[in-house]
Design a protein with these regions (language model features):
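Gly/Pro/Ser/Thr-rich low-complexity, intrinsically disordered segments predominantly at protein N-termini
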Residues: 1-185
Length: 185
């Protein structure tokens, strides 16, 4: 009689111990998924929004801004670990003091992703759903090609901000505002 092997799924902790080997990956439902290579413009937009957020957050002593795909656990059993381009954690979720090791025990209030041409809306919506299901309050999808920002939350319809609109995050960063087009200059 042949034995049937159950598929092996990685946990977030096992995934976190693996060497990167120069690959950009995420853990999706226990499986490693390779991401498309990010080009220089992606890093520019990541730095633009990260700098704007960090400046505001530090000035008002609100929490911490992380970037560059730092992993966060979005679901368990099977585990998923996503790497948002930029994320904001308030001091309510990650208190002042030494930073926790590994994946942080709380989700950020705000996640920002930068859309590349290769990203498909089906996958974007799946990832947005994971973030919102993991207690992220707002997800902003920056679309450099169209110079727009799509803003998602669990309790309202998505909103679209065009280049001349003022982008705000009142639920998590009261007082923060930027004209969308400034993200692309």
């Amino acid at each position: 009689m042949a034995t049937v092997r159950e598929p092996t799924f990685l946990t977030a902790e096992e995934y976190g111990r693996l060497p990167a080997n120069g690959r950009l990956t995420e853990l999706v439902r226990g499986r490693i998924v390779e991401l498309t290579r990010r080009f220089t413009a992606h890093g520019f937009y990541l730095n633009q929004i990260g700098f704007c957020l960090s400046s505001f957050v530090q000035q008002h002593e609100l929490g911490r801004v992380v970037g560059g795909g730092a992993g966060m656990v979005t679901q368990r059993n099977p585990d998923s670990v996503r790497g948002p381009d930029v994320a904001f954690y308030s001091y309510d979720r990650i208190p002042r003091g030494p930073l926790p090791g590994g994946y942080w025990p709380a989700s950020p209030e705000l996640v920002i992703e930068i859309r590349s041409r290769e990203d498909r809306w089906k996958e974007i919506h799946q990832k947005v759903g994971e973030y919102l299901g993991a207690d992220v309050l707002l997800v902003a999808m920056i679309d450099p090609e169209l110079q727009r920002v799509h803003l998602f939350s669990a309790d309202r319809e998505p909103m679209v901000f065009n280049a001349t609109d003022r982008l705000t995050f009142p639920e998590v960063l009261s007082g923060f505002e930027i004209v969308v087009g400034e993200l692309f200059d």
